[in-house]
Amino acid sequence: MEASQDTFTVAGRTFQSRLLVGTGKYRDLDETREAIEVSGAEIVTVAIRRTNIGQNPDEPNLLDVISPERYTLLPNTAGCYTAKDAVRTCRLARELLDGHNLVKLEVLGDEKTLYPDIPATLEAAEQLVADGFDVMVYTSDDPITAKRLEEVGCVAVMPLGAPIGSGLGIQNHWNILTIVENASVPVLVDAGVGTASDASEAMELGCDGVLMNTAIAGAQRPVLMASAMRKAVEAGREAYLAGRIPRKRFASASSPLEGTFF
């Protein structure tokens, strides 16, 4: 399969890149713009409660460097700890972005772990779906929860690989694999990626994409890391499509003895 044919579709929108990136933690908007350009990402997530996209006319506007005409914006509810706040934030985003209805839902449980509050996440997801939103949802790596979120109408499930910003990489490969196997909507690892091998690993498990922010913005050289992540996601996807060899306990000679000359 050619790269141009291996597209990623969510909520009826089709993309070439399977790397989704955030906009926080960069030194300035110029670095934000350059890193996102180099990443090749087409979907860019924005924390509505923390990022100015027009709410504050006297402050720098992210949309001046991340144009909605070039990128698909994915407003998110980072910093929300209740379903009510998350729903309100999504409605604000829709108002600011002229009816844009693709959102990333996250309802956090506490400040220490930033793990999702699952009951509140389900409550918010149900309300947002009923209100006409296309909901991509941050969740735990529990396969049952992921399936339940799909059943309430979320257009993508986004299990954490590890706590947000931890850089620990995927901690529970088997759960992520089970979520992928059970899902009929896209699955994207969201949170915990620390370096390129983590992103590649997520794709090798069969995930449809990877979303990251800190792994790029927090690197010593963010623009170079953005390039590395782009290649890692592409390599991991190709490896998944190619089909890895099975793991074996013992050796298997790469040069068979049959037909040897002596």
Swiss-Prot record:
Reactions mediated catalytically: [ThiS sulfur-carrier protein]-C-terminal-Gly-aminoethanethioate + 2-iminoacetate + 1-deoxy-D-xylulose 5-phosphate = [ThiS sulfur-carrier protein]-C-terminal Gly-Gly + 2-[(2R,5Z)-2-carboxy-4-methylthiazol-5(2H)-ylidene]ethyl phosphate + 2 H2O + H(+)
Which sites bind 1-deoxy-D-xylulose 5-phosphate? 165, 191-192, 213-214
Naming one, the record's GO cellular component terms include: cytoplasm
- Active-site annotation: 104 (schiff-base intermediate with dxp)
Any one GO molecular function term: thiazole synthase activity
EC number(s): the record gives: 2.8.1.10
**Residue ranges the record marks as coiled coil:** none
The listed locations are:
Cytoplasm
Q: Which family does it belong to?
A: Belongs to the ThiG family.
Q: How does the annotation summarize its subunit structure?
A: Homotetramer. Forms heterodimers with either ThiH or ThiS.
**Function of the protein:** Catalyzes the rearrangement of 1-deoxy-D-xylulose 5-phosphate (DXP) to produce the thiazole phosphate moiety of thiamine. Sulfur is provided by the thiocarboxylate moiety of the carrier protein ThiS. In vitro, sulfur can be provided by H(2)S.
What protein name does the entry list?
Thiazole synthase
Q: Which organism is it from?
A: Alkalilimnicola ehrlichii (strain ATCC BAA-1101 / DSM 17681 / MLHE-1)
The lineage is: Bacteria, Pseudomonadati, Pseudomonadota, Gammaproteobacteria, Chromatiales
Gene name tied to this protein: thiG
